[in-house]
């Protein structure tokens, strides 16, 4: 879902 994509992006950004 849309939230899954948001979480995915948030995880990547948070990993920086």
Swiss-Prot record:
Cellular compartments annotated: Secreted
Keywords from the named record: Amidation, Amphibian defense peptide, Antibiotic, Antimicrobial, Secreted
Membrane-spanning parts: none
UniProt modified residues of type Leucine amide: 16
Top-rank taxon: Eukaryota
Main location: secreted
Alphabetical GO biological process terms: defense response to bacterium
Cellular component GO terms, alphabetical: extracellular region
Expression (tissue specificity): Expressed by the dorsal and submental skin glands.
InterPro entries linked: Aurein_antimicrobial_peptide (IPR013157)
Function of the molecule: Bacteriostatic action for Gram-positive bacteria.
Entry protein name: Citropin-1.2
Naturally occurring in which organism (per UniProt): Ranoidea citropa (Australian Blue Mountains tree frog)
Organismal lineage: Eukaryota, Metazoa, Chordata, Craniata, Vertebrata
